[in-house]
Every structure is written in C-alpha cells, then in structure tokens.
Design a protein with these regions (language model features):
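Left-handed beta-helix
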Residues: 1-157
C-alpha cells in the first residue's frame, strides 16, 4: 500500500532508477535512460533531457524545455518552451507554462505537492495560469483565434 505522498514518490523514483527488479518502464528507450510512449511530440535535438525519465504517450514538449530525472511525465501533457522539470512526477493532462520550474514536485489537476506531502491549490494561489489542464483552451489562444476570425471576416466581400 502506497498511502503517503513520500512513499508514492519514492516508489516511482525506484522504478525509474532500476532499483525494483522485474518492473520494466513502458515505451521505447529513445536515449539512454529516456523512455517515451507513443506519439510523443518533441524535437529531441532541441530539448535538454537527462535520465532516468519517462514521457507518456501523446505528450508535447516544446523546444527549450529541460527535464532532469528521475522524472515521470504522464500521458497527454504539454511542456512549454523553457519549462524545467527536475526530480518530479507530472500526472496526465498537465500543462506547464513557459519558463515554469518544478523541482521535487508532484503535479496533478490543480494541485502541486512537494515530496513531504504539503500541497498548493494552484487555483486558490492564483498560479493556475502557470500549471493548467492541457485540455483547456487558454484565454490567450482564444483571443488570438478571435482576432484571426475578425481579420478574415473584415476582409470578406
């Protein structure tokens, strides 16, 4: 039973570090100690990744991101340019904004937890613009789309 955050954290790190025998990391080893699931969108030459790292399927990693292991990134995540993740666990559908730096953190939903179990409600702390749900349409993107549609409509005959 893994009932406490520090225990869960250590269990994931132990798997990534190869300390637990007969447990294999899913995906393909794309670099020594770096495993990726299906359809990971990344230019491997334009990111800085030091294993052990697992990147879940359908995750998007923008140029300039940095990942230092042991780190697990769940499926369908999005790391923006300049985001840094070290010694952390990022659960599915998490979006890390540009220049966000996470060290020794677990991120899931609107919560960020350190390895002692202390949590931060990102929405209540007004930090939800830094770490969000990757499935959400961001207001800035929506604003850009609105401007593009307005430009198209204004040039139509």
């Amino acid at each position: 039973d893994i009932g406490k955050v520090p225990d869960y954290w250590r269990a994931i790190q132990s798997v990534l570090l190869g300390e637990i025998k007969n447990v294999s990391i899913p995906g393909i080893e794309v670099r020594p100690g770096v495993y990726a699931g299906l359809n990971v969108a990344v230019n491997w030459d334009k990111v800085d990744i030091t294993g052990p790292v697992y990147i879940g399927a359908m995750t998007k990693i923008e140029d300039g991101a940095k990942i230092v292991g042991p780190t697990m990134i769940g499926p369908n995540c999005w790391l923006c340019s300049g985001a840094t993740v070290e010694n952390s666990v990022i659960f599915e559908y998490s979006r890390l904004g540009p220049e966000v730096r996470l060290v020794d953190k677990l991120v899931f939903g609107r919560y960020c937890v350190d390895k002692t179990g202390a949590s931060i409600d990102l929405q209540a702390a007004a930090l939800d613009w830094l770490i969000t749900d990757a499935r959400q349409v961001l207001p800035s993107v929506l604003g850009e789309e609105r401007r593009a549609i307005a430009d198209i409509l204004s040039t139509a005959d």
